[in-house]
Amino acid sequence: MELMVKGADALTVSETTFGRDFNEALVHQVVVAYAAGARQGTRAQKTRSEVSGGGAKPWRQKGTGRARAGTIRSPIWRTGGVTFAAKPQDHSQKVNKKMYRGAMKSILSELIRQERLIVVDNFSVEAPKTKELVAKLKELELNDVLIVTGEVDENLFLAARNLYKVDARDVAGVDPVSLIAFDKVLMTADAVKQVEEMLA
């Protein structure tokens, strides 16, 4: 299949990578796994055995008229331990390479169908100036966009860093969540070829 390239000849790409049916269940699973992997999982509370103190019986068993108590760190008490205390845990989910590649292909194919993937021959800025990048994006009528280049472009990254709803990455930094997070995805022809090789 052929992809239209702004200001250049059409680019021939693989049908298996850019012409797939959209697999919603697979994309959902991979995106959820990606988000789960980003969780810190460091929350922690103390059980009655971990709270400091509470070794001595607060008052004798019988004769006071009060309810019996054996420790001041009971979960019923204020300053006591937590009944089902939260503990640090790993939330990450396993995603097979084949599933990950399948989800990426599915997303890229859907972006093409929805006309949200724009391919240009080359995209760069002369200096790390946000104003220059804004002007370039205005020419292309883009404001909510992920810019993907073949290799790390320091100037482009610095120019995009302070812009709302604009992000610049190289091919290695692209993931399923970033592809669906923006209204449009702007890729250079070089980046398209690299993505195709990566997902082959």
From Swiss-Prot:
Pfam families the UniProt entry points to? Ribosomal_L4
Q: Which GO terms describe its biological process?
A: translation
Please give the SUPFAM superfamilies that the UniProt record associates with this protein: Ribosomal protein L4 (SSF52166)
Care to name a GO molecular-function term for this sequence?
A: structural constituent of ribosome
> GO cellular-component terms in the record?
ribonucleoprotein complex; ribosome
Q: Does the keyword Ribosomal protein apply?
A: yes
**Oligomer status and interactors:** Part of the 50S ribosomal subunit.
Please name the HAMAP family in this protein's record: Ribosomal_uL4_B (MF_01328_B)
Family to which the UniProt record says this protein belongs = Belongs to the universal ribosomal protein uL4 family.
Function of this protein?
A: One of the primary rRNA binding proteins, this protein initially binds near the 5'-end of the 23S rRNA. It is important during the early stages of 50S assembly. It makes multiple contacts with different domains of the 23S rRNA in the assembled 50S subunit and ribosome. Forms part of the polypeptide exit tunnel.
Listed name of the protein: Large ribosomal subunit protein uL4
Q: Per UniProt, what is the name of the gene that codes for the protein in this document?
A: rplD
